[in-house]
Amino acid sequence: RFLDDLRVPAAGHRRFLFVVLPMAPWVFGCAGCAYAVLPAVMGDRTGSFGIAFSGLLCLVALGCGLFIQQVGKRFDDVSSARAIIIALTMTLPGLGIAALAARLVSPWLALVAAAVLGLAYGMLLVSGLQEVQRIAGPEDLAGLTAVYYSITYLGFFVPAALAVVSHWLSYPVMFVGGVVLAALSLGVVLMFSRKHLPSALAH
């Protein structure tokens, strides 16, 4: 009985699996790259100002994320995954600029990358929540929201994972790999953007 109470049937909804699931880890993946990975990569250039620079990147990323959350809801479309598509599209240049910043060890480019990744983070977070609200019924909303956040939190492991892989691959290469993975996620969402809509919206 207890386990039955913990079940979230809406988590098996095809729209959740093919639209929300591919984008969710990128929420805090983008944020983590902006305020954890980039400061570390710029360490040799920022020197004694490293802590201040890290704080600046965090402020820029989270500030841009907060800003886009206020306006991002306007891009929502009940008949498609338009807002999520926009959010994942923002992720591509963000990671691309991060790769260039890492290659050139340029704090200025890192600042730009943090801003773009911050925008992507905020847009991803709000667009995913809106999609979850449509998929879940009233009884499943709290549970599905918890599942959604649990998946987004996987992004917090990105900095640690990149630090481990950096023994074999450079950060520019890993950021480019991130662009490829984000593009694949975007491709999946594009394929299912107008499919498996919640029954109340399908007509």
Task: Enumerate the language-model features and the residues they cover.
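Multi-pass alpha-helical transporter architecture, strongest
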Residues: 179-203
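Transmembrane alpha-helical cores of Major Facilitator Superfamily
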Residues: 25, 56-59, 63, 115, ...
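C-terminal transmembrane helical hairpin of 12-TM major facilitator-type secondary transporters
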Residues: 81-126
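Short amphipathic helix-loop junctions that connect adjacent transmembrane helices
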Residues: 36-52
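Transmembrane alpha-helices of Major Facilitator/SLC transporters
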Residues: 54-77, 90-94
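A late C-terminal transmembrane helix in Major Facilitator Superfamily
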Residues: 121, 127-174, 178-179
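Pair of pore-lining "gating" transmembrane helices in MFS-fold secondary transporters
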Residues: 14-34, 111-116
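Juxtamembrane intracellular "pre-TM" segments in multi-pass secondary transporters
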Residues: 1-20
